[in-house]
Amino acid sequence: MGDDELAEIRRQRMMQMQQQQMAEQDQIQRQQQMQAQIQSVLMQVMEPEARERLNTIRLTKPEFAASVEQQIVSLAQSGRLRQKITDEQLRQLLTQIVPQKKEFNIRRVG
């Protein structure tokens, strides 16, 4: 391989890396915009106490909080929310969503 071929390979590699970096930045920007839209909707449809509870849940269970947020946003977009969600209503929603834990009673026989 000559110097020209190596330079061309390096140039192509640099272009690929730049394109990949730009694509990643675009993806991050889209995610940030989507998150901002979700937060905007939540501010419109939830009382401050309910948002605070959801933020507290996000600290311990981020995937679960994201799922709850998506459900609330879909309820708001479908027009099924007639008033702001209060803390008590959020609690009720959470009890419906949280999967029931199976309890195991282990008894020693013998």
Curated annotation (Swiss-Prot):
Keyword DNA-binding (UniProt): yes
Gene3D superfamilies in the record: PDCD5-like
GO molecular function term, any single one: DNA binding
Keywords: DNA-binding
InterPro entries xrefs: DNA_bind_arc, PDCD5-like, PDCD5-like_sf
The keyword DNA-binding belongs to this UniProt entry's keyword annotation: yes
UniProt superkingdom: Archaea
GO cellular component, one term: cytosol
Pfam families for the chain: dsDNA_bind (PF01984)
HAMAP family for the chain: dsDNA_bind
Listed PANTHER family: PROGRAMMED CELL DEATH PROTEIN 5
Family the entry assigns: Belongs to the PDCD5 family.
Protein name: DNA-binding protein Mlab_1482
